[in-house]
Amino acid sequence: MAKVETKNEGLVEKLVAVDRVAKVVKGGRIFSFTALTVVGDGNGRVGFGRGKAREVPAAISKALEAARRNMITVDLAGTTLQHPVNARHGASRVYMQPASEGTGVIAGGAMRAVLEAAGVHNVLAKCYGSTNAANVVNATFKGLRDMTSPEKVAAKRGKSVEEIQG
């Protein structure tokens, strides 16, 4: 679950995961921390980042900085998605589909953080396979990035939006 939720520069910042990792050397283990964060404006722009440092706060600040640099724009249909989306990253597979008004965000931990930061308020989502937070966030991003609006599809095909939607 996303732990920290702060607003900075109009951006919603969410901490998805913090892990302790170890580097094994001759004299023993050197511990450090990795942080996974999601940043979004709640209006179709969202980014994620990973940071690693010897202390947790430093790892989180590095991850937030990386997330601000790694932002994408998502074509939303009001408060939901344009169409159902499948995506995968590693062994994680995600499925997201638009939902009617009032449904809410029905999604698991890491996916929920990304969708809420992007400004999606009504969606049905499911994660299959690996539930590793980093892979789920990556797969969710791939799905959101590959989603296209009817206007873009119509422009590519040289047709009107009415012809595309039937």
From Swiss-Prot:
The keyword rRNA-binding applies. It comes from Acinetobacter baumannii (strain ATCC 17978 / DSM 105126 / CIP 53.77 / LMG 1025 / NCDC KC755 / 5377). One of its GO terms (cellular component) is small ribosomal subunit. Belongs to the universal ribosomal protein uS5 family. Part of the 30S ribosomal subunit. Contacts proteins S4 and S8. The keyword rRNA-binding applies. It comes from the Bacteria. Keywords: Ribonucleoprotein, Ribosomal protein, RNA-binding, rRNA-binding. It holds the Pfam family Ribosomal_S5_C. The N-terminal domain interacts with the head of the 30S subunit; the C-terminal domain interacts with the body and contacts protein S4. The interaction surface between S4 and S5 is involved in control of translational fidelity. NCBIfam families: rpsE_bact. The gene is rpsE. One of its GO terms (molecular function) is structural constituent of ribosome. With S4 and S12 plays an important role in translational accuracy. Located at the back of the 30S subunit body where it stabilizes the conformation of the head with respect to the body. InterPro entries: Ribosomal_Su5_D2-typ_SF (IPR020568), Ribosomal_uS5 (IPR000851), Ribosomal_uS5_bac-type (IPR005712), Ribosomal_uS5_C (IPR005324), Ribosomal_uS5_N (IPR013810), Ribosomal_uS5_N_CS (IPR018192), Ribsml_uS5_D2-typ_fold_subgr (IPR014721). This is Small ribosomal subunit protein uS5. PANTHER family: MITOCHONDRIAL RIBOSOMAL PROTEIN S5. GO terms for biological process: translation. PROSITE patterns: RIBOSOMAL_S5, S5_DSRBD. Residues 11-74 form the S5 DRBM domain.
